[in-house]
């Protein structure tokens, strides 16, 4: 402790503090900037690296679309060609549902492993695990004529067990493309089946209030079968 008479010493101490504090502050600032600069330098490549585009949001290439065969007719994806031997457990728009839940007439898991067929000639857009709630998914793009106009529609097969096709592969109506599954054990075996009016291989929500872009699957196939109702065989 300084004595009362040591005024000169106190003055000298205060002057030294005034000199030391700015220097300490400067050194601390430089140190912090160096740390943050090093962190930013490590982060910089991540900030400027382009994010990978999910295949679910890529558009089908023009050559892919142009080379599609024109489908002459559409059939149902399981059971017989006209949908016999199946039942629809949850129809399009019921409970905001964007597709049909198709089941074998035996119920529960009696249809596990049964064939899933391409509904028409087309090309595979996507064939992979669709993530939580979906299990394996196959999407096929089709071209068809309506009133002389070439149009495009997408068939969507979800919760499947085994996938038997690959992206870009051409398929014909009635080709087996998958087997009925349970979405990796999440549900009883059935096929979640959608028909869509867009070409993007989008996995989708499954349930939605706004159904624009989605079509009633059973109604569409019934309107575009091009075959009598008693044609139940899978003969092309």
Give, region by region, the residue ranges found by the protein language model.
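Hydrophobic alpha-helical membrane-insertion segments, chiefly the h-region
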Residues: 31-42
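N-terminal Lys/Arg-rich, disordered targeting/topogenic segments
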Residues: 1-21
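Surface-exposed, glycine-biased beta-strand/turn segments
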Residues: 42-136, 173, 182, 216-236
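Short, solvent-exposed loop/turn segments that connect beta-strands within catalytic domains
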Residues: 108-111, 145-152, 201-207
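Conserved, short, structured surface segments that act as functional micro-motifs
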Residues: 138-141, 169-235
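Active-site-proximal beta-strand/loop segments in catalytic clefts of secreted hydrolases
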Residues: 105, 120, 127-128, 141-143, ...
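Short histidine-centered loop motifs in beta-beta connectors
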Residues: 110, 117, 148-174
């Amino acid at each position: 402790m300084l004595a009362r008479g040591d005024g000169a010493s106190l003055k000298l101490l205060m002057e030294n503090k005034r000199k030391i504090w700015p220097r300490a502050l400067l050194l601390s600032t430089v140190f912090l900037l160096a740390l943050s600069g090093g962190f930013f330098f490590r982060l910089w490549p991540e900030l400027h690296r382009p994010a990978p585009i999910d295949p679910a949001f890529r558009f089908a290439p023009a050559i892919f679309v142009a080379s599609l065969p024109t489908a002459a007719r559409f059939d149902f994806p399981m059971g017989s060609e006209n949908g016999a031997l199946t039942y629809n457990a949850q129809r399009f728009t019921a409970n905001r549902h964007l597709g049909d839940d198709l089941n074998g007439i035996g119920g529960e898991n009696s249809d596990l492993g049964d064939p899933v067929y391409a509904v028409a000639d087309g090309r595979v857009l996507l064939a992979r695990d669709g993530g939580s709630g979906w299990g394996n998914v196959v999407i096929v793009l089709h071209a068809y004529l309506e009133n002389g106009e070439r149009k495009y529609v997408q068939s969507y097969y979800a919760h499947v067990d085994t996938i038997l096709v690959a992206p870009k592969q051409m398929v014909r109506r009635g080709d087996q493309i998958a087997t009925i599954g349970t979405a990796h054990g999440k549900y009883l075996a059935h096929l979640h089946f959608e028909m869509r009016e867009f070409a993007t291989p989008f996995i989708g929500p499954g349930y939605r209030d706004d159904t624009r872009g989605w079509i009633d699957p059973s109604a569409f196939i019934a309107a575009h079968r091009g075959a009598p109702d008693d044609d139940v065989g899978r003969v092309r």
